[in-house]
Amino acid sequence: MAQARLNLKGVSALLLDSDQFSRGLIASMLRGFGMESPVTGQTGAEAMAYLHGNSIDLCIMEAMLPDMSGAELIRWLRRPEMEKLRFVPIVVLTSYAQLRLVSAARDGGANIIVRKPVSPQSLFDRITWVARVARPFIDGGNYAGPDRRFQVVDPPDGNYKRADDARRGPSSAGPAQPVNKLVQAVSKGPSQ
């Protein structure tokens, strides 16, 4: 069975990871998906400085940055003043999948949290899932981000692992965040 291919040519991404090796490895994966030059950084301050004058289509960040938590940076991005950037899909990577870190990232407004080490196939699947699953964007008093309730959303790899998942079948989602280049790249289907 042929695997789908994702071509991220024209998609801009910000990759934040304090570990140089991990950052380089993930950047190589993104280039393998067709992304020409992901912007990389180590700290939340670097990200904030870059984002004040630039736009991105995807943000991939470590859950704990040297100067702040990923959740703090996500909340900063999801503020109303950030206009277009507040809807950017955010993938949080973590080596420590402690409930506290995962909950903080989710409650901050992350689209998905992925445990490291991450394989190219796993990263591909998660990026594709984030782009394809139209989760409603919630803008409430204490929270701004994708709907945190996963009860009606298919698993990222499409594999139903529980008996009640198979009975429920694929879901349909409501209105989502605006379409960006990432969503368009995934919607085009396999690259040629």
State the predicted function of each range.
Residues P66-D67, Q98:
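The feature encodes the CheY-like receiver
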Residues S69-L85:
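Short amphipathic alpha-helix used as the core "switch/output" element in two-component signaling
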Residues Q20-Q42:
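Two-component/phosphorelay signaling modules centered on CheY-like receiver
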Residues R100, V118-A131, R135, D139-G141:
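C-terminal output helix
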Residues A27, E72, R86, A97-I112, ...:
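Alpha4 helix (beta4-alpha4-beta5 surface) of REC/receiver domains from two-component response regulators
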